[in-house]
Amino acid sequence: MHPGWLSNAYLAWEEGTREGFFVDSGAPLEPLVELVEHEGLTVTALLTTHTHGDHVAGDSELERRFGVRGTQSASWAQAIPTPGHADDHVAFLVDDICFSGDLLFKDAVGGGPDAEVIRASVLKLMELPNDTRVLPGHTDETTIGRERTENPFLRYWFGGEALDEPCRVAGEEATLVVWSPDYDGKGKALVRMTDGHESIVGGSRVER
C-alpha cells in the first residue's frame, strides 16, 4: 500500500502455469517484483481499473521490467464496466475475486459527481455471490456479502433510511443523505443539492 495515497497494487498468479498478472500500479512495487522473482513467475498482464494517477504511477516501471502495458482486457478476466468514479473505470472478476478499484471499498464507495451512476455500477457488483472476495483500490479487503449488509451506501440503496440532515457542501446548502467512514479517515457522503441532484463527495467537503 502506498503510504500517502493508501492505494493498493496486486500481484496474482496461476499455480500450474506460474503465469502472473498485476492489477494497478500505484503502490510500492518492489515487494511484488521480488515476489515475482522468488516464485519464478512469468508476468503476462497489467490490468488497470482506471487511469487516475494513484493507480497507474508504476506503469512505466512494470513495462520496463516485464514488458507489460496497462490494459482492461484479458481472456481470463471478466471486465465489468463500472463508471462513476472515473469514466474509464472497470472492475475485474478473476475466479472468486473481484478487483473493485475505486468503486467499492470496505464500508464506503468511490466518490463522483453523479450518485445514480455510481449506484448503478455498485449494484452490478451486488449480483456477485456473497462470498466473493473484494480487493479494492485502497486499504482493506472485504466481501460482497459484508458490504451488502454493512456498507451504509448499500443499506440506503437497498431501502434503508436516509439521514436527511441539513449540511453545506463547498458553501452551498445541501442535505446529507448517507455518511460512512472512508479509507482516508475523513468520511464519505452522499449529498443532495437544492436542485435535487445527488453526488458522492469526500467528507472534508461537508459542513455538518
Residue ranges, per PLM feature:
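Conserved beta-strand hairpin/beta-sheet module of binuclear metal-dependent hydrolase folds
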Residues: 1-39, 91-101
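Active-site metal-binding loops of divalent metal-dependent hydrolases
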Residues: 2, 25-27, 51, 84-86, ...
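Short active-site oxyanion
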Residues: 18-21, 42-47, 131-133
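A contiguous pocket-lining binding segment that forms or flanks enzyme active sites
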Residues: 102, 108, 112-130
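Active-site metal-binding motif and surrounding structural segment of the metallo-beta-lactamase
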Residues: 29-71
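Core dinuclear metal-dependent hydrolase active-site scaffold
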Residues: 11, 74-93
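Accessory terminal helices/loops
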Residues: 120-134, 139-208
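Histidine-centered catalytic micro-motifs
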Residues: 46-56, 80-89, 134-142
